[in-house]
UniProtKB/Swiss-Prot annotation:
Keywords: ATP-binding, Kinase, Nucleotide biosynthesis, Nucleotide-binding, Transferase. Signal peptide: none annotated. Its EC number is 2.7.4.9. Phosphorylation of dTMP to form dTDP in both de novo and salvage pathways of dTTP synthesis. GO terms for cellular component: cytosol. It comes from Ehrlichia chaffeensis (strain ATCC CRL-10679 / Arkansas). The lineage of its organism: Bacteria, Pseudomonadati, Pseudomonadota, Alphaproteobacteria, Rickettsiales. This is Thymidylate kinase. The gene is tmk. It catalyses: dTMP + ATP = dTDP + ADP. It comes from the Bacteria. GO terms for biological process: dTDP biosynthetic process; dTTP biosynthetic process; dUDP biosynthetic process. ATP binds at G7, I8, D9, G10, S11, G12, K13, T14. GO terms for molecular function: ATP binding; dTMP kinase activity.
Length: 202
């Protein structure tokens, strides 16, 4: 099974991907669950990730092509081999983030992004959890974590992108709304339990 978590920065998707990995590891064994992320996932990609996040003046198309190349590396080295071994793969960000951020957010033609994704992968997620959160709350969380962020209009476009992706892929995508303002342990557990409920129905 291939599971992905998506959402805007500060949505809590990384926390949820880790919680799900721990939960499934207790059931199926730690050796049968693979937790990974994009951009990243391999030693090479993690190095490139660090460089990209520090890059100044990189245009949106160049950034997209970097992400697509990294996805290919990640897919052939980590994701597909793990799936071939019947392992459960949980990925923090995947194709939908590219469509939402580079497509809806930065204005690159989504059909081009789809073509590039089709070029570098041949297996798609079985289930995608889109963790939705208020823009102001997400930016507040991101600031607390020391992350830089773009203008709010950009994040509204990205959030709308995730909504559209979910509407176009209702059998794969499940939107879970985090309405919390404090993001304490109860809020985190609420989202986690919603994730588990969805998994129990598939």
């Amino acid at each position: 099974m291939f599971i992905t978590f998506e959402g805007i920065d500060g949505s809590g998707k990384t926390t949820q991907s880790h919680l799900l990995a721990e939960y499934l590891s207790e059931i199926y064994g730690v050796n049968n669950v693979v937790l990974t992320r994009e951009p990243g996932g391999t030693l090479l990609n993690e190095s490139v990730r660090n460089l990209l996040f520090k890059a100044q003046g990189l245009d949106s198309l160049s950034e997209l092509l970097f992400f697509i190349a990294m996805r290919r590396e990640h897919f052939v080295k980590i994701i597909k081999p793990s799936l071939m071994q019947k392992k459960i793969v949980i990925c923090d960000r995947f194709i939908d983030s590219t469509i939402a951020y580079q497509g809806y957010g930065q204005g690159i033609d989504c059909s081009l992004i789809d073509q590039l994704n089709d070029l570098v992968i041949d297996v798609y997620p079985d289930i995608t959890f889109i963790i939705d959160v208020d823009i102001n709350e997400s930016l507040s969380r991101s600031c607390k974590n020391g992350y830089e962020f773009a203008d709010m209009e950009f994040y509204y476009r990205v959030r709308d992108g995730f909504y559209d992706i979910a509407k176009k892929n209702p059998h794969r995508c499940h939107v879970i709304t985090d309405k919390s303002e404090t993001y304490d342990i109860d809020d985190i557990n609420f989202v986690h339990l919603e994730v588990i409920k969805v998994l129990q129905m598939v």
